[in-house]
Amino acid sequence: MDFGLKGKTAVVSGSTAGIGFAIAAALAAEGARVIVNGRTEARVATALQNLRQLVKDADVRGVSADLGTAQGVAAFLQQIPETDILVNNLGIFEIKPFLEIPDSDWLRFFEVNVLSGVRLSRHYLPGMLKKNWGRVIFISSESAQQIPTEMIHYGMTKTAQVAVARGLAQSVAGTGVTVNSILAGPTASEGAGVFVESMAKQQGVTKAEIEKQFFSTARPSSLLKRFETTEEVAAVAAFIASAQATAINGSAVRAEGGVVQSIF
């Protein structure tokens, strides 16, 4: 299937590693011109090098900017004033009991996980509407529906992303622009890898045993019974960004390995 992305420009926030990097690679493989973003020039340069090795003739460019701040977004937009596809992937997470989460953490999580996408979408949507074609995708999580008690502030931001995506989709109804969110499940990203390795060392067991333990206790409802790969999530994002996915609009697309115990 031809995704129809040749000649399209795609911005992927927070794309030097993990799900964001995998999405950048998937879009580049489909012929899109991909803008890679990270906070430091070093990480961006490494990501570009890896992408060019992974995807033959990849058309990629990097822009270092902290999109978790208004100033960082403004600097980024000066260099990349328009795009056809926007993937709001930037996000942070942290395990912390509710009673220990200060106001500053709530505000920081909201600004990075939610406002980064709001600011980018607010800028890029008018250009998409003018061309009558565009794709906006928010990378959310199953935590949007099943708020994790060990990081309620993170879950709050994932729910907010779904709400923003649905509202934006309704605001551009009847146009060639679609806005969706993807609810990813527990994924073998850089952060998850650090967590698993740390727990394995603490308990003196293998990483495979920690993964099995995680899915038997923390996410027992998972049908996949393992961490998703970043490429599995990226494949969903690439299709939603495609010209073939016009009928998918305003949706919270579940790609969470069956963790959410609901048929709808």
Feature annotation, model-predicted:
Residues 121, 157, 165:
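Active-site helix of classical SDR
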Residues 84, 92, 99-118, 133, ...:
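Catalytic Tyr-X3-Lys loop
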Residues 173, 178, 248-250:
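Short, small/polar-rich loop/turn modules that mediate ligand/substrate recognition or access, typified
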Residues 141:
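Residue(s) in the substrate-gating loop at a strand-loop-helix junction
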Residues 126, 170-171, 246:
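Alpha-helical segment proximal to the catalytic Tyr-Lys
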Residues 99, 148-152, 174-175, 225, ...:
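Active-site loop immediately N-terminal to the catalytic Tyr-X3-Lys motif
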Residues 9, 16-17:
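Conserved glycine-rich cofactor-binding loop
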Residues 146, 237-238, 249-264:
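Short C-terminal tail/terminal secondary-structure segment
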